[in-house]
Amino acid sequence: MEHIDGKILPVSLEMLGEARRLFDDYNARYSSNEKVVAVILGNDIKDYSKELIEYGADVVVCADHPELKDFRNTIHTKVISQIALDKEIASKIEPNYAKQFKKPRYIFFAADSIGRHLSSTVLVELESGLASDINKLVIKDLNVTHQIKTDGKPTDFKKTLEMYRPDFSGFLWTTILCLNNTTPAIKREYYPQGCSIIPGVFEPIKPDPKRSGEIIFYEPKIEENDLKVKVLSHKIIKSEVDFEIRKAVVSFGRGIKDAPDENIKLVAELAKQLDAEIGISLPISKKLLPASQSISSTYMIPARVIGTSGSKISPMLYVAVGISGAMQHIAGMQDSEFIVAINPDENSPIKNECDIFINGRMEDVIPLLVEELKKQQQVVQAG
């Protein structure tokens, strides 16, 4: 569970909420009573534990130590791995399960700057696999045939975590599985089934102050050799773009490709008339289109990305210009109150996501919209 300046980060509560929903269903289907365990590291963090229980944790494992005050990947990896493998903790969480305990069944991290580092190193320590940047989770029983993992034979895999993320096209789901090898020559287990979860994808549950749970205080085993890196100071770097202060957002995508500079200037003029912030789709941030340096450095930057790889927004008005509607982009703007899309492809997927779809080229449509907006402003000013 990530936290900063006295607050648990939203993505941690989002993950906890999804874990709660998954395990309420899991325990009902499998007639079990397995627990959702939240692990939190830091210094002077005891007060967080009750909040995590209110947000869905059955058990909170709290590692409170002065050397855990600031994030250091080496130490945090070591302590989380210690906790994950500790049979004494397992016996406190579920005595009946402790004898057969080896590793947790599942483990979730945030797909943010800290979680992306931490998830990879922890899963290496636990000798399992990692699915990154996940948008959807399902637990089910599967029957799988795989040439290597099952020696080409149909094999049952119980309580398997299906981890979903958009494929490289952005329009189809990729399902990632972390399965044991059952082939005799290479037989081995892969636990926990782990993933990092995109912030903003899941919703926290409503906190329940009356909810009860168990708090376990863990004494981390930190040695002098773990302290080679010292954190001297830290500061929060504010984003170059703040979507929250504007009621409207105008975004553009690869539809600008025929004339990047000219088309981006059109988008900027429309945004100006709407008093809107400017966003972009993920491919634009890769700077693969031949735009000028001034245009590229101003508009084609990661801070403007809308979607699961960027910002999740909910303005009163969202205008998508030349954006086809990949799933990862839709996830970032679908909470907008009113959505307008401008696209020459009448079969573009974004057509199904908007309130108004304008089938046309941006070069033709935007000048007409700008002209009409100017007329309306003149009427307002005259009145």
Residue ranges and their predicted role:
Residues 1-383:
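N-terminal glycine-rich FAD/FM-binding segment characteristic of electron-transfer flavoproteins
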